[in-house]
Structure formats: structure tokens, C-alpha cells
Amino acid sequence: MKRLVLWLLVVFCFASAEAQHFKAYRGAVPGSYNFWFHDPENGAHKDPKAHFPLLIFLHGRSLSGHNLDKVKRYGPISAVAKGLSIDSYIMAPQTSNGWAPDKVMQLVDWAIKNYSVDTTRIYVYGMSMGGYGTIDVCATYPDRIAAGMAACGGATVKNLEGLSKLPLWILHGTADRAVPFSASQKVVDAMEKTGTDRLIFTPLKGVDHGRPARLFYMTQTYDWLFSHSTKDPGREVCRDFKVTPEMLSKAYEDLRDLKSNSDKEDEYME
């Protein structure tokens, strides 16, 4: 009985800690998506002059629907709950079918209106369907997005010229059977024709579709994103970071409680 009570207490404390990090919003932005929001100060706003970056996470198809709890399966909500510190506002919306750049930007405007967002440091990242969404948002709003990271995705918008205006990191596993490697390659080929020097393309040799989701648990992912600002002279891309298949394999080692769950979590990532 004592063990049961202790176990329930641990679960309750974990759930309470997670709730303090993220708050669910449903219907807060008419015409847009429901979303989770993370306030790094937990509503305290200790320094009224402090402004934080805003990070937008776009999930893959497996998390689509009308149940916001599905968005906890992988990505920043899971990463923060398991011990990763991300010092920024985070929005994790949920879509039922694809990502519309205009709707994503409605969420950004809501965050700017309600929180002290550093408007020069707004970032978007995602994988699979979220990778498509990331590229579409970056192509549509390059002047508002400081940097983007798209894993195992592609593009649905026809005009990709905007991608040449901001730092963008595209990653894709060569063994991806869900979204072919060629989907990212087409975007890269189109960007290279513009002569852009703001693109990083990382083919992940032998990596399948689910493994790149470990990017969301790696500190260098956030270090790279947060190193950019729309105020940077020339909007240069930072090339001080890299991602390899080996680094993805070790992504969970520095985070609590992830080792035993790593293979199981990959099953949900698409």
C-alpha cells in the first residue's frame, strides 16, 4: 500500500511539474489551431523588461487530430518534461490535416500580443508533415522567422524563393520510407538555383523516418536556432553545429528517463 501511495505521489508531482511548464489553449485564436504554450517564467514575469524568443513546433501526421494530449508524445513538451531546459516561449499547436502558414502566423501574433516576445527571434521547426509546414512557413514569412529547421519533410508551396532569405537547416534520413529523401532534395535543388548561402543540408546516411525526431531532445538544436536573429547583418547562417546519425543515437543519454523509452518513442514519430 505504501508503495502504491508513493508511486501515485510521484506521478502526481510529475504531472504537476509538466502542467506548470505548458498550458493548453483551445479556441484562443479563432480560425487557427489549438495549442500548448510554454512560458519560461511560468507566469511570474520577474523582469518586465525581459523578452524571450518564440519557438514554434509543428508535429507530424501521427499527432494530428483534436486531442491536444497527442502532441506530448514527442517534441519540446516531452523534452522539457524529461529535463531539457529551453529558455524561450514555446508554442506546440495541433492540426488535423496539414499546416497553413497563415494560421501559424496567427498564433505568432497572439503570442506577441499576450507575452513579451522578442520579435527578432522567432523560430519554427518540425518533422515529417511538420517539416513540410516548417519549410512552407519559412518560404512565406522569411522576414519574420529568424531561422527554421525541417526534418524529413518537403514543401507544398510552389514559390520557394523566400527560403533563400533566412537561415534554414534541412535534414533527412536516406533510409526514410515514409517521406522519400527526394522530397527534401527537391527543396534543396530549388534553393541552390537561387545561389543562397543560408542553407544547411544534412543527409543522414542510413537513418529511417522516426530517428530524426531525436533532434528535439538535443541541446545543439536549440543552440543553433537561437544563434540567429532577423537583425543579424546579412542574415548569415551559423555553421558551428552538426548532426550525425551517431549523435542522434546518443541524443537521449543526457536526459533523465529516456534510455528505456527511446526505441518505444521512435514508433510514434512520423
Segment roles from a protein language model:
Residues 69-71, 180-190:
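Short alpha-helix in the alpha/beta-hydrolase fold that links the catalytic acid
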Residues 164, 169-172, 176:
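Short beta-strand/loop motif that positions the catalytic acidic residue
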Residues 61, 95-96, 174-177, 205-208:
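Acidic beta-to-alpha connecting loop that harbors the catalytic carboxylate
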Residues 17-54, 132, 137-140, 187-189, ...:
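A domain-start/cap signature at the N-terminus of enzymes
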Residues 52-54, 58-107:
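Active-site machinery of serine-nucleophile hydrolases
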Residues 42-50, 99-128:
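Gly/Ser-rich "nucleophile elbow"/oxyanion-hole loop immediately N-terminal to the catalytic nucleophile
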Residues 111-114, 120-164:
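Primarily recognizes the serine-hydrolase "nucleophile elbow" in alpha/beta-hydrolase
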Residues 191-210:
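Catalytic histidine neighborhood in serine/cysteine hydrolases
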